[in-house]
Amino acid sequence: MLKYTVKRLLQSLVTIFLIATAVFLMMRCLPTDYYFTEEQLMKFTDQQKTAALEAAGLTDPIHTQLIKFYNDLLHLDFGTSRRIQNGAPVVKVIGKKFGVSMRLGLTASAISLVLGVLMGILQAAFKDKVFDWIGTAYTVFVNAVPSLVSYSLVLVLGSKYLGFPTLYSTRNVSASSVLPITCLSLASIAGYALWTRRYMVDELTRDYIKLARVKGLSSREIMFKHVLRNAMVPMVQYIPQSILLTVGGSLLMERFFSVPGMGPLIESSFC
């Protein structure tokens, strides 16, 4: 197990190295105007632009720039912002936004895990009955409808009938976080419910479940002490992936609800 874990970690490091190098090289292929704001492009002369590029080390040989890039990376020096907040450390710029996205993402992940597993348990317990049909319809709806449409429905229902704020506000964080967290949770709840139902239904067909029923164990004991425990084993592998997707998939949601998180920052960094 240890050997396998170390092997996978090394493979991950190699993958990260290759991706980082590819991104670095692609950034260096961009026109030099990209490194200046619109205001700087209008004011700077060609000599001033050249001097600024030299000061940033962007005129050095590409291998020298790459070595410096990884050296700075190892020292957690991500440089300074040139387009978002000119001259501000990148770590500081990200730090202001990262906390907001992380809080919403982790809260949504926790809620979706609890509600999704609970829904999957009920669907498996009442297989081919009304609750199972409702859960299946919800899963199909969430996966079939574009995110923008489902977000709009949440916005209308939540603001008109429940009175929640339509935009994120730092003055009223708790109330204004409800609708963004709900939107982030929709897909994850459906995913957890689908996985839980699938594995629990598979477990219910095992011979040991039939033996447990013959021994007189109640349906509740069978469901929670045996079926759920065994069904969670293969499902655990999906939890980290789901959390990463929930936390990282907030670009549209943050733009939709004007959340000052990583989403708008990532978007503006490419514009």
At which residue positions do the language-model features occur?
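Residue-level recognition of pore/gate-forming positions within transmembrane alpha-helices
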Residues: 12, 43, 113, 140, ...
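Short hydrophobic, aromatic-rich alpha-helical segments embedded in or entering the lipid bilayer
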Residues: 45-76, 177, 257-270
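Alpha-helical transmembrane segments of integral membrane proteins
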Residues: 2-3, 98-131, 147, 171-271
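Hydrophobic alpha-helical transmembrane segments of membrane transport/permease proteins
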Residues: 16-67, 161-173
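Residue-level signal for discrete positions within transmembrane alpha-helices
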Residues: 12, 97, 101, 137-144
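An internal, D/E-rich "acidic patch" concept
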Residues: 58-117
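Membrane-water interface segments at the C-terminal ends of transmembrane alpha-helices
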Residues: 23-30, 71, 137-165, 185
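Generic alpha-helical transmembrane segments of integral inner-membrane proteins
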Residues: 9, 13-26, 106, 110-118, ...
